[in-house]
Amino acid sequence: MRSAIILAAAVLTLSAQSELPPGILLLARVKAHTRAELKRLPNCSCLETVHREIKGARERLRPLDVVRLEVLYSDGKEMYAPPGDRRFAAEHPSAFAGGGMIGDGYFALYLSDLTGEGRVSYEYKGEEDVQGRRLARYDFRLPAMMSGQTIHMVEGTGTVGSTGSFWADPATYDIVRLEFHATEIPPFLPISESSHWVEYKRTKLGENEFLLPETASTRMVRLNGEESVNRMGFAQCHLYEAESSISFGMKEEIPGFATTAASDTELKPLQALLEITTRLSKPITLENAVGSLIEATVSGNVPRKGTVLIPDGSLVRGRVKRMEWNQEKGGYYIVGLEFREIDAAGVKYRFFADLQMLDRAPGVGFTLVFDTTQNRQVAGSTEILSLPEVPGVGTFFVRGRKLDLPKGFRMNWKTRPLLP
């Protein structure tokens, strides 16, 4: 009798499954599989390269800069550092880019939101051919009140909902592609559109394979018509161990990557108003992406109360904060350099200083002067461009398409009190 009851239950289960609308059973399996994949995702690190473009309301897209960061996925969170640095920070990646649009959440946040219980409404759209693969497509809607997605801007930070689609492999249940657009945008954020596309791929880490982002892109449009587009790639992914030194061993040559730096908690503060002259240890060119580590040396002893506080030749470490191309008025770059620490005979100091003077070099300066005369027979007028001060970041212009700050390029700095 017991076996008959079990058999009857099995028949009822099969009958119920056969009566489910198309795609329902597959959706349940895709969601369960994705949650299991996120749970088993180990601590790992990838090199993220971001090609950023911008345009005005009536312009074509033009390159802005290239940002390279190491992104560490650890215990459900994403952290960031310049390539080659071990000081991963849990702050938003915009802190490393010095302006412009940049995003996060590609490892787990979006997939976690998408497959959460009771959060999302789905609609099965059938199977489609995508790059030679037969994939099941689902449209979805995620309300802002259930979303973990936020948009960070100068005007503020707000939580948004999303609507979009994802494509899953019906055989492996892997989500292969994700596309979504922001909804319920808070009125204080001056944007009309924010869209994301992510491609996922099985990546071998150690002896196992995991589902990781391979490429992604974002597009944001402001209410005034200005548009920003980012195209991202993730490469050189590997398991991360807290005690190991990070080195990607990149196949392409990417200058400017430096050795491991100390954590901020290990750095001693420097008193304010010290005058320090530095010289670049290596040239800075267009090959140095935003986020790349840079090095310089102190030129001349820095005295303090009759003794040498920082000896000549001490190593100074930092990173490229900005490298933005602007094509107006003949074209120019905005360059921002942020030095963070000085190694003075084994004692590491926090370097927090304002740039006072630049070496003489063609087209390099704190301001740009343009002749705005329309008629050469009439006395001319000029337009002067300057840059806002950013504490701790030396920002300046380089006129023309060529950017080459040579080895030995001199910069004079004055230290300032650490911000509270």
Each language-model region and where it sits:
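Short hydrophobic/aromatic-rich motifs at helix boundaries and adjacent loops
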Residues: I5, F96-G98, P311-D312
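Generic anion/oxyanion-binding catalytic loop in active/binding sites
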Residues: I5, S162, F397
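Hydrophobic h-region of N-terminal signal peptides that target proteins for export
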Residues: I5-Q17
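Glycine-rich, flexible loop segments associated with nucleotide phosphate handling
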Residues: E155-S165, I334-L337, G400
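Contiguous beta-sheet cores, especially beta-hairpins with glycine/small-residue-rich turns
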Residues: V176, T265-P420
